[in-house]
A protein has these predicted regions:
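N-terminal beta1-alpha1 cap of cysteine-dependent amidohydrolase-like domains
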Residues: 1-28, 32-251
Length: 251
């Protein structure tokens, strides 16, 4: 920086924008997730960079989808929208107004809740999306289509797309639900402290089991403390790669 004082704005925000814009020039749509919680100090530079990107690329080329939690209060049997209202208010104070609000909850949200969020957060009713917990993560695309999220994106970005053909996806879920045979697979690893350490391996096994019409039953075996003979009870063993001494020894 040639001796200049390095500041959050513009230096850090400019670098964030450079990385977001520099992913590829050969794409039609780019999805950029900004994690964390609105209001946290760590997220402020990213929100400012996102605000600037919309200004630079044009309102018609950028949309903001805000995901919030709608908790269920058991004793009063109520779904509380106040956290969502507060979150949107804080987000707006950063200069960003969400185009779509996705409401995460442990159950389906009725039109009354969605209408309330629409009214208090100044978002069209059609752009308030219910995203309840589902039995299978692969049901989510169908649920988002049912809620009209794809139509909201099409409208906001002026896209001209046809109705998606989801029959193969539906058939895949139908086949998955009808599987009866089970296979026992062990993952022999070291990094079990963080659940997502072997996420790609687990998802690959899920895809393989679905393709072979079997139900996957996973077992986690610590490579630092296991008996080789115990592996005989499994139909298969997966040994993921690792790093350094602990990534090799014991495997």
């Amino acid at each position: 920086y040639l001796g200049a004082t390095v500041q959050v704005i513009p230096h850090i925000t400019d670098e964030i924008k450079r990385r977001i814009k520099g992913i590829s020039n050969d794409i039609d749509i780019q999805i950029t997730e900004i994690g964390g919680t609105v209001g946290d100090i760590e997220i402020l530079p990213f929100l400012e960079a996102a605000r600037q990107i919309r200004k630079e690329l044009g309102q018609e080329n950028v949309m903001f989808v805000h995901v919030t939690l709608v908790p269920y209060i058991g004793p009063s049997t109520e779904m509380k929208t106040k956290p969502t209202q507060h979150s949107v208010s804080v987000l707006r104070s950063s200069g960003i107004s969400p185009d779509v609000i996705v409401l995460r909850s442990d159950r389906e949200l009725n039109d009354e809740i969605k209408s309330k969020v629409s009214s208090f957060c100044d978002v069209s009713f059609e752009d308030v999306i219910s995203a309840p917990d589902l039995g299978d993560i692969y049901e989510v695309p169908l649920k988002m289509h049912e809620e009209g999220l794809d139509k909201s994106v099409d409208t906001r970005l002026n896209l001209s797309t046809n109705e998606p053909d989801l029959e193969k996806w539906k058939n895949m879920l139908h086949l998955k639900a009808g599987v009866e045979k089970t296979v026992e697979i062990a993952i022999l690893g070291k990094y079990f402290g963080l659940p997502d350490s072997y996420l790609s391996v687990v998802e690959s096994l899920n895809h393989a089991s679905l393709h072979n019409q079997v139900k996957l039953n996973l077992h986690w075996e610590d490579s630092d403390n296991f008996n080789v003979e115990d592996l005989n009870k499994f139909d298969g063993v997966v040994i993921p790669g690792g790093f350094g001494y602990r990534g090799i020894e014991g495997k």
